[in-house]
Amino acid sequence: MFCLLVIVLLALQSEINAYNISPYPNSVLNFPELEGNRRSSYFGFSLVIREKSIMVAAPRANSSLEAQRNISEPGVIFRCYFESGNNCSPYNIDTKGNYKGMPNDGLLTAKNKDFRWLGGAMDGGTRDSDKFLVCAPRFYSINNENDYNNGMCYWLSDTPKNIDSTEVMEKWPLRIEKKQVLKLADTNLIPYYSMGELGLSAHVSDDNSKLLMGAPGIDQWKGSVHLKQEVPSIKTSSGRQRRGMNTNRKCNECNPEPKNFGQEEFSYFGYAVSSGYFDSSNLSTVLYVATAPRGNNQFGEAYIFDIYEDSIYKYHEFRGNHFGEYFGYSVLAEDLNGDGKTDVIISAPLYALRNSYDDGAIYVFINKGSFTFEERIIRSPAGSGGRFGTTLSRIGDINKDGYNDVAVGAPFAGNGSVFIYLGSENGLRDPPSQCLDAPSQQPSKYGSYMFGHGLSRGSDIDGNGFNDFAIGAPNAEAVYLYRAYPVVKIHAIIKPKLQNVNPEEERVNITVCYRLSSKSDSKAKALMEQELVIRIDIDTKSKIKLAVFDEEHGSQMSFKAKAFHEEICSEFQIEMDKRAKFTPIALEMQYELSKKIPNSGDFCEDCAVVDPAEPKFVTEYITFNTGCATDVCVADLKISCINASSTLVLGTTAVLRLTYNITNNGEFAYHPKFSVTNSAGLSLAQVPGNCKVNEAVMVCDLNHGQRMAKGDTDSLTISFDVRQLRGRSLEIQAEVLSARDESNPENNKLTNVLSLREKADIYVSGVQTNDHVVLKESPYTAEVVNYYEIKSHGPSTLENLTVSLYIPVAYKTPDSTNVKHIVTSSPKIQSKYAHKIMPINFIDQNNALANNFAIDHDQSTLLFSATPQHENVGNLSGIVEQNPSISLLNEDLPVNNTLVLNCQDTNVTLCVPVEIRLENGLQLKPEELMNMTVSFTVNLKDADDIWEYFVIQTDLKVHKIGDPTLSSFTIEKKIESNVICKHAEIAIWKIIVSVIVGILVFSAATYALYKRGFFKRAIKDDLKQLIRDSFEDGIIRTEMEENAQSQGDADLDEKLDAYADTTGKCTHV
């Protein structure tokens, strides 16, 4: 699982995500069950691979030997042959049991082999003739009931099939009795050899002349090493003795004393050991490297050194960088870059990345000569807890590229993983070329596999010329063998038969050649013959296909072909389009091996692989006679814009059109193209047919895709959608280019910068929506409701606007500092725009008004709770704004008893300002209405009686962020004022007194007139008598006329006249 994740990550970083090691084990060696084992034997803990077999250590196994039946877990070495069904049998290095004996001649003789961990460390070359070194670091001797954990090693000069126990050599250099425990001057006893643990690490030099064993417990865990060697005559190339060295002090059996080279206590020097050719002035001399992971104050250290009798001479020191990372847990010496000098890899498996633990890392030190090293850290790709670098192994040059490769184990990454790193001219390549995961993700009965804790060297066990290697999984009691596939290199070329093809040619022949090579000496079939898959593409990057193979294949042809060591060539014919004869045509040939290695443990005997770092394609061009002075035409394209403006008023147009002219003043311009982009990422309102848009960049073919000769011109009109355009400026960049060189590239580009302006006409209106207020009686309160509208007539859309409303709430009395409040209720303000309730902000510049108004507002309504109070005017200030005059509305109001409250008159009026902000993308768009409803209660109870009319003039202003002069818009206002009429009420007592006084005055006047005879009316009596007499005469005359008519009296008139004379009255009027 870990490797699957790692491979995914590595695939993103590099094409090298698998290589020539089989991805799954090709065979498995399992622990031969022995009697008495109750826990894991750790079969596979350490490995030494040979030509046809592998030595496998099981340091916790019980022995089947009769002499060791009563010994608990002495450890067993197994030899497993690859050609005999992977059968494993004990390779009995030590056939004897425990021995109880007294010291002899000052040397311990008792041997206790219980839990001695035989095979805890092993080393040896890959040939059967190489020496073989096996150690048991927990071997101990008993003397006077004291256990001395000296450690013991065994070595053989070679590994014959049938081992002779007499040929096994024991190495027990720490058996000196008097050095087991030392007494200091203060009588304290310290362990010296008694906890030495010789063989915790083991190493056999490449020339088989030296055996180096680590003993990190010597002298209170200062640590040291033991060296068995054949002493050569060491001279430099000039015949002079090497600096700092005395050949007389060379030893066959060397036990350096830590006190002689100043080793730090508890530093564990000798924890890991190796050797190599580090001295660039003498590359024939072997020097040693050993680590002390708890040295350097637990930062860890390692030394390159030589040994002389009882001390060492240090040539170079390596130091860890992090406390507790266990720098020096493992060490590997190998020439990684092929320069002949041995490089060094030191692991730190407890190295932790941030927010992680025990990730692990390896420090790679590239030898630059004269004991100077270039350091590089490769951090774990295995994740937290994997302990990358627990084991390191030299696997040789597995891909035959001339550089040695290494394997790095991370046995605690799940069930364990192993990473393959390839050498190169610059050291190790990173990332790894391959990751091998434990075959199973399920834990064994003993827990996680610890796959990778055992790593063998590389050895070609199947004879195909490439090194194979084995991986041990101690907790699974198994060893997995991984074989390597041969690596071949594909050599392929593609080329036209003719150079500079004539423009009139309709067909062109091309030649394709290919062959295989390998640096391996093997003559295996996999190298001799491989099938290739070849694909040829014509002009893949061209949008217009200018050449094809034929109607059947089009511009792509694929085929399979056998490849050998010898080069094979084939010819193909390409049909040319007339448009292509002046344009170079790209031919790209891709190739790969047809047969892939199986994604399983089955090994394919006739398969091979190609180094993923090698190219997988080759490109060539068909070129034509250009008709120019040289093979390469030099054009001189020039671009200009004929209708560009320096200013754009936003909203005046939905589409911005720019027309560009392109002229060629040079030689032929092939594939002329025009591209345009803009700083605002505007989309195109229209895309011409010869253009394509990709991520706001439009690219167009000029001259219908044909070449442009000298003097040719073309033009394009580009239409940008500017409906959503915002900002202060717009930069439009246009460029023309061709497939060939340009003589004057400066005029190929043109940048137009347009200054963006906003312009809008805003209309503001306000009216009172309820009836005019007339207050006739106490408490002289009434609600006033105003409605306001704000509308922009454009053309621009405005943003970052603030609408401010000013409401008069109080006034100052003349010649006084007192303030009288006329708005004492809780004004409610609600605003809507674009179907949204707008938030209201109360602004009190000096907090003075807040003393009188308790504020309670939410997203939709603003409330001011007020109580009328008299305040000192010194604490208040109005809106500072000059206004030359204040009119009294359209109504004819008396000036002397009318009070006008206007927020611009700061000497009289005190106002409450509120704000509505259009922010967070909200914009005032043309013809979209914004409204505001304001209601408040006026209270004129405490107003001065001299005022009969109160005029409240609210004001509304608009501001824009970044436009202090309001140059981007104009405002027309029509806001009606609120007029409140107050008629004073007459007191009852005044009415009663007035009535009584009136009655008294009336009575007195009447009596006076009576006394003066005003009420005597003589003329009235005469008129009554006259009326009465007239009425009586009328009756008499009527009777007389009636009588005369009845008697026919002709003298009636005379009788009437006579009657009139007697009465003295008129008979006619």
From Swiss-Prot:
Annotated membrane topology is: Single-pass type I membrane protein
Q: Which InterPro entries match?
A: FG-GAP, Int_alpha_beta-p, Integrin_alpha, Integrin_alpha_C_CS, Integrin_alpha_Ig-like_2, Integrin_alpha_N, Integrin_dom_sf
> Where does it reside?
Membrane
Q: Which GO terms describe its molecular function?
A: integrin binding; protein heterodimerization activity
Instruction: Spell out where the chain is glycosylated.
Output: N62, N70, N282, N415, N509, N643, N661, N800, N875, N896, N907, N931
Record topology, Cytoplasmic segments: 1007-1069
Q: Gene Ontology cellular component?
A: external side of plasma membrane; integrin complex; membrane
A biological process from GO: heterophilic cell-cell adhesion via plasma membrane cell adhesion molecules
Which parts pass through the membrane? 986-1006
Indicate the secretion signal residues. 1-18
Residues exposed to the Extracellular side: 19-985
FG-GAP repeat segments:
29-89, 104-165, 184-237, 255-310, 312-374, 375-430, 437-499
Q: In which tissues is it expressed?
A: Expressed in lamellocytes (at protein level). At the anterior end of the oocyte, expressed in the follicle cells that will form the operculum and the micropyle.
The UniProt entry lists the main location of this chain as: membrane
Cystines in this chain:
none
A Pfam family cross-referenced in the UniProt record is: Integrin_A_Ig_2
Q: Which UniProt keywords apply?
A: Cell adhesion, Glycoprotein, Integrin, Membrane, Receptor, Repeat, Signal, Transmembrane, Transmembrane helix
Q: Tell me how this protein assembles.
A: Heterodimer of an alpha and a beta subunit. Alpha-PS4 associates with beta-PS.
Its biological purpose is as follows: Possible role in cell adhesion. Minor involvement in the establishment of the oocyte anterior-posterior length.
Which family is it part of? Belongs to the integrin alpha chain family.
Protein's name according to its UniProt entry: Integrin alpha-PS4
